[in-house]
Amino acid sequence: MAEAALVITPQIPMVTEEFVKPSQGHVTFEDIAVYFSQEEWGLLDEAQRCLYHDVMLENFSLMASVGCLHGIEAEEAPSEQTLSAQGVSQARTPKLGPSIPNAHSCEMCILVMKDILYLSEHQGTLPWQKPYTSVASGKWFSFGSNLQQHQNQDSGEKHIRKEESSALLLNSCKIPLSDNLFPCKDVEKDFPTILGLLQHQTTHSRQEYAHRSRETFQQRRYKCEQVFNEKVHVTEHQRVHTGEKAYKRREYGKSLNSKYLFVEHQRTHNAEKPYVCNICGKSFLHKQTLVGHQQRIHTRERSYVCIECGKSLSSKYSLVEHQRTHNGEKPYVCNVCGKSFRHKQTFVGHQQRIHTGERPYVCMECGKSFIHSYDRIRHQRVHTGEGAYQCSECGKSFIYKQSLLDHHRIHTGERPYECKECGKAFIHKKRLLEHQRIHTGEKPYVCIICGKSFIRSSDYMRHQRIHTGERAYECSDCGKAFISKQTLLKHHKIHTRERPYECSECGKGFYLEVKLLQHQRIHTREQLCECNECGKVFSHQKRLLEHQKVHTGEKPCECSECGKCFRHRTSLIQHQKVHSGERPYNCTACEKAFIYKNKLVEHQRIHTGEKPYECGKCGKAFNKRYSLVRHQKVHITEEP
């Protein structure tokens, strides 16, 4: 079949004026037409198809001009005055030979010659005009191919280069019989040659034709050759050309033009991944993704090598992304908080989840939700006990080995990450990076509701719960709920009275290790902040600033209900509970509630019998400090 395709071109007959004359009897279009089967048409290259089109166009137009078009059935043959593209659709369409069983060709882009006559009208070629003249013989021809054939016969050459032929046609297209210009009927423009007018008129015709067929003739000839076994597949394929999208998902309103694509798209919502790699077990939503994975990861050589560390990667894109770990490049910047990312996927996930508050991955065991799927997978190991790494010092368990190694530094005292600005050292690199933002003033996590910014993402997430009202951490003893797990753990120590961190100097106990470290500065006088007014020392600059308000009388925090002012914001928050009626601190023994935590602690001493305040004169003990102060006045009055 391939050999037949190579010799197809010379067998196409060319109709000349000498061949078509009314005196020679009726000649039908069928007599000179050449038809190809679907298989034969597929073997032609683009140049051969173009030649077929041009020859058939010239033959058909020439026969129509001399009135010899008799190949049309009588009931469909129009009059000479009304000959149009629609009336000769049968004569213009080449037969596709024996049809393929159950084959349905795409009607939008099939490669057939159904636009021969329309193209002739579109180009504006008139049969009685002969714009092509032979320089050698002076003979005139209606078509360039006739001129070329005539010149080949005169010179004996069978092949003329395309460049020489084009130049010859351009130089010989003027009509010397008249000095009249050729006007365009659509716009006020004249042309000295008929060829110039014809070329100009194609611009108008193309626009009209684009409205009729949504594509130009040239695009339709070479765009699509797809053949389908079932009619339903043709219908779905034609939606590619029409833009129709028949399948719509109700939840999100996304439209797709194929049922297959619609089913594949639904997997993104139900997390179905039916295509599993038989080598590594990784699953994928789409079959083509699985094929690409197997070719890229398991079969293809890793030919892209990083010059920094020597790591080999399977694609140039992966190499570019990997090199960002060395050069620190983070090209994807969030326009909300300014945070930058190395990978586009991480950037998109950040925008979709962090700022919207969406947490789509929910643990089926405890109901806790997560932003990323890998966070949920990591969390589920808490329930399954999978891959737990236990500390030999304290027995604490970790999901990852690296987390255990980091934890060991607490026992060894190793702090390898040191701040170059202040010399402070940290166990984890992440903590160092967060600490450095104190020096730079960077606060990349910005709340889109109130505009407050944060150094750490954990602080930002905890702050978001203030707006949402979410209190996911509930005390099992009293039912009180908290925004963060850390706050819940602190609260638990109220019930257990646990103060595991004890000062070796004075024996005072603390709930948290950080509080003990702050307290120990008082004994070591390390980095103490002293008040210039009274000489009192504080372990933190923040505490000193709060204390100095005592001397200045500054009370910047004012209650909007009653106008009362306070030195500290925490005092204002506690005071506002008087107006709201909120009493969050409940006694577990008698269910009495209090506004302030210290009042609850004092009250609980009634039940426990604890009396920590002892008089130095008589040894009498009290459960409240002010009771001791009032008692001591008795001894003052007794003194002479």
Curated annotation (Swiss-Prot):
User: Where does the record say this protein resides?
Assistant: Nucleus
Q: Which GO terms describe its biological process?
A: regulation of transcription by RNA polymerase II
Instruction: Indicate whether Zinc appears among the record's keywords.
Output: yes
Zinc finger, C2H2-type: residue spans?
217-241, 247-269, 275-298, 304-326, 332-355, 361-383, 389-411, 417-439, 445-467, 473-495, 501-523, 529-551, 557-579, 585-607, 613-635
| Family designation | Belongs to the krueppel C2H2-type zinc-finger protein family.
Q: Where is the KRAB domain?
A: 27-140
Primary location group: nucleus
Q: What does this protein do?
A: May be involved in transcriptional regulation.
Q: Which Pfam families match?
A: KRAB (PF01352), zf-C2H2 (PF00096)
Q: Which SMART domains match?
A: KRAB, ZnF_C2H2
Q: Which gene encodes it?
A: ZNF549
Its keywords, alphabetically, are: DNA-binding, Isopeptide bond, Metal-binding, Nucleus, Repeat, Transcription, Transcription regulation, Ubl conjugation, Zinc, Zinc-finger
What is the name listed in the Swiss-Prot or TrEMBL entry for this protein?
Answer: Zinc finger protein 549
Q: Which GO terms describe its molecular function?
A: DNA-binding transcription factor activity, RNA polymerase II-specific; RNA polymerase II cis-regulatory region sequence-specific DNA binding; zinc ion binding
Q: Which GO terms describe its cellular component?
A: nucleus
Provide the cross-link position: Glycyl lysine isopeptide (Lys-Gly) (interchain with G-Cter in SUMO2): K223
